[in-house]
């Protein structure tokens, strides 16, 4: 145990003690939070906005030519007219607008829409019609599919999406489609059929995320990737698309964890550290797809937990702040269950976020260090429970 702890310290990996302190201590954060290392919104958005300046009121002079005098008349020439025109831009147009429910350090560039988008995403993620069944493997599938088989499908879907370099967010949405489909449709254990379901879910998700997907891949290529070689293989993909769409009731727009990661980091800049944080958060959310049970958490909870661990991984300190709590709607203590479950799936937190899902997790290959991490996180209350199926 001590040797493992020493190795953890030498590698710079945050131990469970740091995780406990981060989760339990940040709820009492005072006004003396260090600004150094905080990744929040820029203090000013001046460099990101066009510099319009304050334009003075415009004055347009309309000059009318002198009209010839009519015969027998003596009319005066019409005088010059000055028309006052309102400024093209309001004063201080280069200043961002901040609404009442926003942190003062977080400017909103689209104030009339930002709050509406937030409310819409929150409503959609809690809509039962747009959520997978909590225990679809035990109920709908009736034991015909195990958590390991589902993980194998996710791994195949990940490899499929990376092979064709499909749009970001495709894997998250494809897994969302898959879980909703399996929640209402009993599936066989035929390998080719399962591959067809997974690949078609990726195909649908890719077309949803990127309108130019068909320039990269078509139905015949999807079927061939699954192992089908007949001349009419594209029809199998089309039929499966129709079946999945019907199972989803043609509702494809539910937010995923990836959606909320993008939403919560929308004020990040283009700095190296901020890009690293976003990449790590996306890798954490993608890694959670392999474990059956994370779908029971709301996507916003999974996204916020991934950002928490990404900040702990990249910054090494201050994984949460008042601005993040206000932005996400979650205090650090609210994320305890999901953070600990996500943390327990990572054998080496320092490097795991940058390893793509290339294998199916097998409990027989869990390292001794990983077991020690799991045992050290037993402070989690029973109500949070490990979602792993």
From Swiss-Prot:
Keywords: Cell cycle, Cell division, Cyclin. The keyword Chloroplast does not apply. One of its GO terms (molecular function) is cyclin-dependent protein serine/threonine kinase regulator activity. GO terms for cellular component: cyclin-dependent protein kinase holoenzyme complex; cytoplasm; nucleus. It comes from the Eukaryota. The keyword Cell cycle applies. Gene3D superfamilies: Cyclin-like (1.10.472.10). GO terms for biological process: cell division; G1/S transition of mitotic cell cycle. Disulfide bonds: none annotated. Belongs to the cyclin family. Cyclin F subfamily. This is Putative cyclin-F1-3. It comes from Oryza sativa subsp. japonica.
């Amino acid at each position: 145990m001590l040797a493992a702890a020493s190795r953890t310290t030498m590698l710079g990996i945050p131990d469970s003690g740091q995780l406990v302190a981060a989760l339990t201590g940040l709820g009492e954060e005072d006004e003396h939070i260090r600004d150094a290392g905080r990744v929040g919104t820029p203090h000013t958005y001046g460099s990101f906005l066009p510099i319009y300046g304050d334009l003075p009121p415009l004055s347009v002079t309309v000059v009318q030519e002198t009209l010839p005098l009519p015969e027998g008349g003596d009319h005066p020439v019409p005088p010059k007219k000055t028309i006052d025109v309102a400024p093209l831009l309001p004063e201080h147009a280069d200043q961002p607008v901040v609404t009442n429910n926003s942190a003062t350090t977080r400017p909103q560039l689209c104030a009339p829409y930002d709050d509406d988008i937030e409310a819409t995403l929150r409503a959609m993620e809690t809509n039962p019609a747009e959520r997978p069944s909590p225990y679809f493997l035990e109920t709908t599938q009736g034991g015909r599919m195990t958590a390991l088989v589902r993980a194998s499908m996710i791994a195949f879907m990940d490899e499929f999406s990376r092979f064709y370099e499909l749009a970001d967010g495709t894997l998250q949405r494809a897994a969302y489609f898959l879980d909703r489909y399996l929640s209402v449709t009993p599936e066989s254990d035929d390998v080719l059929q399962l591959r067809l379901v997974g690949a078609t879910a990726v195909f649908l998700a890719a077309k949803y995320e990127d309108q130019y997907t068909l320039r990269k891949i078509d139905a015949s290529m999807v079927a061939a990737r699954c192992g089908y070689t007949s001349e009419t293989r594209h029809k199998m993909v089309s039929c499966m698309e129709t079946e999945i769409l019907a199972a989803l009731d043609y509702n494809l727009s539910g937010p995923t964890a990836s959606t909320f990661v993008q939403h919560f980091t929308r004020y990040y800049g283009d700095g190296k550290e901020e890009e690293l944080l976003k990449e790590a958060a996306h890798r954490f959310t993608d890694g959670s797809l392999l474990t059956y049970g994370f779908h029971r958490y709301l996507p916003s909870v999974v996204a916020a937990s991934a950002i928490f661990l990404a900040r702990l991984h990249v910054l090494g300190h201050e994984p949460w702040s008042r601005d993040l709590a206000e932005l996400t709607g979650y205090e650090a203590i609210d994320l305890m269950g999901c953070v600990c479950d996500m943390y327990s799936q990572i054998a080496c937190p320092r490097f795991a976020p940058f390893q793509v899902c290339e294998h199916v997790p097998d409990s027989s290959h869990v390292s001794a260090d990983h077991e020690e991490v799991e045992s050290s996180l037993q402070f989690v209350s029973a109500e949070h429970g490990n979602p792993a199926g």
